[in-house]
Swiss-Prot record:
Family annotation (SUPFAM superfamilies): Thioredoxin-like (SSF52833)
GO biological process: [2Fe-2S] cluster assembly; cell redox homeostasis; hemopoiesis; intracellular iron ion homeostasis; iron-sulfur cluster assembly; protein maturation
Originating organism: Homo sapiens
Role: Monothiol glutaredoxin involved in mitochondrial iron-sulfur (Fe/S) cluster transfer. Receives 2Fe/2S clusters from scaffold protein ISCU and mediates their transfer to apoproteins, to the 4Fe/FS cluster biosynthesis machinery, or export from mitochondrion. Required for normal regulation of hemoglobin synthesis by the iron-sulfur protein ACO1.
Residue span of the annotated presequence: 1-31
Name this polypeptide is given: Glutaredoxin-related protein 5, mitochondrial
Phosphoserine carried by residues: S156
Main location: mitochondrion
Length: 157
């Protein structure tokens, strides 16, 4: 990452660590493990990415991300109040890890899917967060971003 994207990701990582660990995730977040039934075939992956409105393939779980980029994705979703999503830990299944890279033709993890469509990784999600596109995409899915409430509260003061 370069410049402002790197600084913003670093700030998110620091914020996430200081926000307190446990109890952040509501009942909607499903750390689904590999969930692919021991494989990463295109048919299985197609079913996984279309199963939920928001699907994330990451290293680790939302409660314990195992890399900074996965942590940043989790924190961005948390900032927006997105709690109902499926999270698949690619570290649990090497076939899933390679399969999702082949499926998306994207070489890195994490990977984010909205309504069955590949969005990108950490850098893309961070950019969408910064420029407001993520709020709009979530709105299309019927998901209200918590940042809208925060902005409304600030505007009323």
């Amino acid at each position: 990452m370069s410049g402002s994207l790197g600084r913003a990701a670093a700030a998110l990582l620091r914020w996430g660590r200081g926000a307190g660990g446990g109890g952040l995730w509501g009942p909607g977040v499903r750390a689904a493990g590999s969930g692919a039934g021991g494989g990463g075939s295109a048919e299985q992956l197609d079913a996984l990415v279309k199963k939920d409105k928001v699907v994330v393939f990451l290293k680790g779980t939302p409660e314990q991300p195992q890399c900074g980029f996965s942590n940043a994705v989790v924190q961005i979703l948390r900032l927006h109040g997105v709690r109902d999503y499926a999270a698949y830990n690619v570290l649990d299944d090497p076939e899933l890890r390679q399969g999702i890279k082949d499926y998306s033709n994207w070489p890195t993890i994490p990977q984010v899917y909205l309504n069955g469509e590949f969005v990108g990784g950490c850098d893309i999600l961070l950019q969408m967060h910064q420029n407001g596109d993520l709020v709009e995409e979530l709105k299309k899915l019927g998901i209200h971003s918590a940042l809208l409430d925060e902005k409304k509260d600030q505007d009323s003061k």
